[in-house]
Amino acid sequence: MYDKNLGTKQKALKINLDRRIYGSFAEIGAGQETAAYFFKAGGASGTVAKTMSAYDMTFSDAIYGIEEGGRYVVESRLMKMLNREYNLVEKRLSEKRGTESQFFAFANTVVALNFQKTNESHGWIGLQFQLTPGGPTNYVVIHVRMRDNENLLQQQALGIIGVNLMYGCFYYYKSPETLLLSLMDDLTTERIEIDMVRFSGPDFVKVDNRLMSLRLVKNGFTDAALFGSDGGVLQPSEALYKKHILMMRGRLRPITNVHIDLISNGQRQFLAEPDVDESKVVLISELTLHNLKAGDRVIDEKDFLDRVDILCSLGHMVMISNHHEYFRLMAYLSRLTKLKVGLLLGSPSLQDIFEEKHYEFLPGGILESFATLFSRKVKLFIYPTLQADGSVYSCENFVVPDHLRPLFQYLVVNDKIEDIRNFNKEHMHITTDSVLDKIKRGEPGWDKLVPENVAQIIKEKLLFGLPAENNYLDTVKQIHQAVGNL
C-alpha cells in the first residue's frame, strides 16, 4: 500500500531490516549519496554487500571500459555498471545466500553543478534486481535533471530519488503507476525532473513504457517524453544531441494525406537550407497533452497508443509534451540541440501565433515570446490553406493586424518564415475532423484520404470509432475479389 508520508530514512531502514534484499551500490561522478542514506539509517549490514565510488575517469574506464564518444553520463555506461556489479554479486554470493536473498545492483552516473554553475546537471540511475530468491532479474532505469542551484542540494536530491527507486522496485512493483509516483516522494519538480523511465524484465512484461512516459508528463515530472520510430522510449537530450529537428505538431487523429504532403514538401525545403546536414535530421511528430484530451478532458490511453503506433509505422519519432505555446516548445528544443530546428505548420497555426492575447501574461508580450520562438537557429515552414472561394491562403496574402505587419515582414525577409511550395492542391480540402467523422460513420472513401498503410491499420484494429460492420463488409469484398481472381 502506497504511503506518501514515508520518509527517506524510514524507507532505507525498512529495506535494511528486510533480510531478503541484498546487493551492491556503484556510484560514479557526483552521485555519491544513495548508499550513504542506507548507512545513516542503521542496519546497513543487512542490505549492503559492497559500495563503490569511481570518481576518477581513469579508474572508471579501467573498471567499466571506455564509452564510444568518450561520454560518461550516458545510459550505456549505466547498463555496464549494473550488469557488472550484479554479476559480481551473483558470482560471489549465490552459493552462500542465493536461496534466501533477492540480489540487486544499484548504480548511477551523474554530472552535478560545476563550481562556475555553467553546466547541465543530469544523471542516469538504475536498479537491476530479483523479486524472488533465485528468480530472473528486472531493470528500472530513469534519467533525471537536477534543478537545485547548490551542489550539496543536488547530491541530497539524488540520494533521495535513489532510495525511492529502490523502495519502489521492491515494495510497489505490482503497481508500476504507484512505483512511478513514489519516485518523487520527499522531492518536488523544482528540485528534480524525471524525463525518462524504462521498465524491463520478466516481471514487467505487461508494462507499456510509452504509457509510463505519458504519465511522467501527466504527473508534471517532466514537460516532454520521446519515442523512437520503433516505439521504444528515448531520453530526449541523448537522442537529439547534435541533431537537426524537423517537427510537426497536431492532433493527428488520424494523420491524413494533407499531413503527408506537408511533411514531404516541408522536409524537402528544410534539407535545402545551407546550414542543414541531411545525415543529422530527425523528423518528430508532436502531440500535446491538450491535443490528447478527449471531450471530457481525460486522456484516452488506448487512443494515445494507437496514434503513436500509426506515426511510428510511418518512421516518425513521436514526442508528447506539455508545451502548449510554441515559444515554450522552442525554448525546450533549443536546450536539446544547438543545430537548426524547423517547425512545420499550417497557416491557421501561424495565425494563432500572431494572436497577442496568448502572451498577455508575459512582461514583454508578443515580442518576448518571439525572441524565444524565432531564435537564431529556428525557421517556420507554412503550409497554405484552401479558402471557401477556392483561393489559397499563404504568407503572400497573410492577414495580420496593421501594427504587427512590420514584425511579420521582418521575419519573412530575414528567412524565419517561409511558405511550403509545390503543395498538392488536391489534398488541401482534407481536414482531420472531416476524416474522423467519415471514419466514425463508416462512410465509404475515408480510406482514400489517409496513407494506405494508415488505412490498413485503422481497419485491422477498428481505430478511431470505425464501425465493426464496416470492417466486416470491407473484408467480405476482399474475399469476393480474391475468389473472382481464382
PLM region descriptions:
Residues 1-486:
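Nucleotidyltransferase catalytic core that binds NTPs
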